[in-house]
């Protein structure tokens, strides 16, 4: 398999070189983002958005620790610490702290004040614009959370007797599909929603806090209509006094490759059967232009595929079928799914409809007309790039930045994006797109059926037989497909 991978990579580079856009140039970070690292290791990133004067000021503090750093005896510590933080005034007087949290909440886009996951803890504040006093208080509060919490039996008991405002990612860590996806991963034994073991030892929570809440493992992000230089100075003054340094690296969360199985999972997450045709591959960080162009090509191929299937279903007047497409990065595994919403008794028929279209695209590709329409649409979107950017509010900009950091993607300036994207669209051909589609559709795929609780379990063997009859290639085609197995870059989305 190593040889296959190497052959493929060489083939991909030759294909891109023939289009004239392989470059090893490092992507240049968007200079609109001011960023730095304090002497104690804390990283900060600030974006001033004068084009959005009425938007709220978004503040995020990410601590690179979560439930994966807990031992069995420490279960629940990573969830308990922010609970304790939310019941303390954080260096402010009690009235100031109350006011900060009342105003630091966007009623239009409510977000939990803290989200704990396997590898991170995220503190969220959304402040009214033109309130520099509140921003100063928010930074004071977060700096206090970062290294000055009071953890005693009394403060722990007070926190545990108060309402739990700390959310987890994912929101339901025990949901059936999620537990299935974690099989074979160390994450399965480190649930961020796990309660504290009794009796609670405050001294052990304090030791855990001091070990993992160190400034060199923190990133602070501020986005809004602010004076970036003034905010940077305030960050240095407020956070610069924090002490501590990581002596033990945090475990890196990993997922096992998605198994190409056909499974039915009962869950409360759906009200109607949802069948997902799913594949996953290693996510490749995007730090240089050639990687970005490879990602764009794979991404555009997937979008073209979705357009094609939707149009064919509409043309054939398909009933009782809903179609969705979803790509995301989960702990550096890129996962994509074609989701079919269907009544239980139409599942086999609807899978057959979609699989037939997938097989046609894999074997014959998209038509020149479809390709031309897609590129025209993308060129139109590119012409509106700056208008779109100006309409993007601070909440969205902050979320995009968080995802880029998480997925190791360099954010580039709109001007650089426009230039690279235009060159990419001008160089793209229908043959290149069809080759990429062939590669993606020749991978082994899983059939994951989510069923509402209480529904009779569907016969997955029947679905698998339908799929195999249409999609499993002949022996000769299978060999060709294996040699074309893609180096994959998948669509980033919110964890």
UniProtKB/Swiss-Prot annotation:
Alphabetical GO biological process terms: proteolysis
Keyword Protease: yes
Family designation: Belongs to the peptidase M16 family.
Domain of life assignment: Bacteria
Pfam families: Peptidase_M16, Peptidase_M16_C
Other facts: Has lost the active site residues.
GO annotation, cellular component aspect: periplasmic space
Transmembrane domains' residue ranges: none
Name of this protein: Protein YhjJ
InterPro entries: Metalloenz_LuxS/M16 (IPR011249), Pept_M16_N (IPR011765), Peptidase_M16 (IPR050626), Peptidase_M16_C (IPR007863)
Subcellular location: Periplasm
UniProtKB keywords: Hydrolase, Metalloprotease, Periplasm, Protease, Signal, Zinc
GO molecular function, one term: metal ion binding
Signal peptide boundaries: 1-24
Nucleus recorded as keyword: no
PANTHER family (UniProt xref): NARDILYSIN (PTHR43690), PROTEIN YHJJ (PTHR43690:SF17)
